[in-house]
């Protein structure tokens, strides 16, 4: 449910939590190609007007009061945060079954060269009880066209699957959250506002809710995942989830799949340039909430 469930993401929540050991990126463009991103103020004015928001003011410790030997290790204290909840009037919002939680919007500072662009960052999994609840695989109720954690032909999938477990016992949700926090900090430092779809160990937002919020508040959506299932004990590389051919004529996919795949390709190429291992050709076509 894209404009659809979660925008392009590095791999999805309903997804393939059991296929290959490496980080997956599902990157999905919601409204326009990357170079056509709308300013954050316009997005918020047009789309967030109806959503419930709460301002959370946190007080940062003045840097001059922090001992010199520990100043460099102090975590960043963010202020002027907004909690964004699911607006029932948004398209596809009625397909969500778990939606009492909230995403958190982090504004970039003016000192960072604020760009007025909102990047949705989705730390995969992390919704207690999500595996016991079912949501539609596609907005129109049609069946899945590929396999994954939910088999091809199914019309419903777990609202949020539990994810994989690393060989040392660490659950995927913990790793994706830390990844999301690192990505958030880097994006904020570069002037991008960041919409954290999951900002803590647990958020009561299913894959549909996360995607719909992102569709209406962010310029693009990046979901972070890891895969396993083949018994490998090494990192096989990064890839993004591309849109299966069979979905490219179904709305809202038809209006967005090209932007989705373009962003995914750009993300993988950026990782390649930084020396990250890339799996195969850098993409895998899977029918997920974000890609349908």
Language-model segments: what does each one mean?
Residues 1-292:
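Catalytic-site microenvironment of enzymes
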């Amino acid at each position: 449910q894209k404009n659809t469930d979660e925008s392009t993401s590095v791999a999805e929540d309903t997804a393939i939590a059991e296929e290959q050991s490496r980080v997956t990126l599902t990157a999905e463009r919601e409204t326009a190609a990357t170079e056509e991103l709308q300013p954050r103020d316009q997005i918020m004015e047009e789309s967030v007007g109806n959503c419930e928001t709460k301002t959370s003011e946190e007080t940062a410790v003045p840097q001059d009061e922090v001992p010199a030997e520990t100043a460099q290790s102090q975590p960043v204290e963010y202020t002027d945060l907004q909690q964004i909840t699911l607006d029932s009037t948004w398209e596809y919002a009625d397909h969500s079954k778990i939606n009492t939680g909230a995403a958190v919007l982090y504004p970039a500072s003016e000192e960072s060269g604020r760009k007025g662009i909102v990047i949705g960052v989705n730390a995969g999994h992390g919704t207690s009880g999500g595996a016991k609840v079912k949501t539609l695989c596609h907005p129109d109720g049609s069946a899945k066209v590929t396999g994954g954690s939910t088999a091809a032909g199914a019309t419903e999938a777990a609202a949020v699957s539990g994810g994989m477990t690393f060989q040392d016992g660490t659950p995927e949700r913990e790793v994706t959250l830390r990844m999301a926090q690192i990505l958030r900090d880097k994006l904020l430092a570069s002037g991008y506002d960041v919409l954290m779809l999951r900002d803590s160990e647990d958020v009561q937002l299913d894959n549909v809710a996360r995607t719909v919020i992102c569709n209406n508040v962010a310029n693009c959506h990046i979901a972070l995942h890891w895969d396993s299932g083949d018994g490998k004990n090494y990192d096989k590389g990064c890839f993004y989830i591309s849109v299966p051919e069979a979905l490219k004529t179904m709305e809202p996919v038809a209006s967005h799949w090209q932007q989705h795949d373009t962003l995914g390709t750009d993300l993988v190429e950026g990782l390649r340039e930084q020396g990250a291992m890339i799996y195969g050709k850098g993409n895998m076509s899977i029918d997920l909430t974000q890609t349908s």
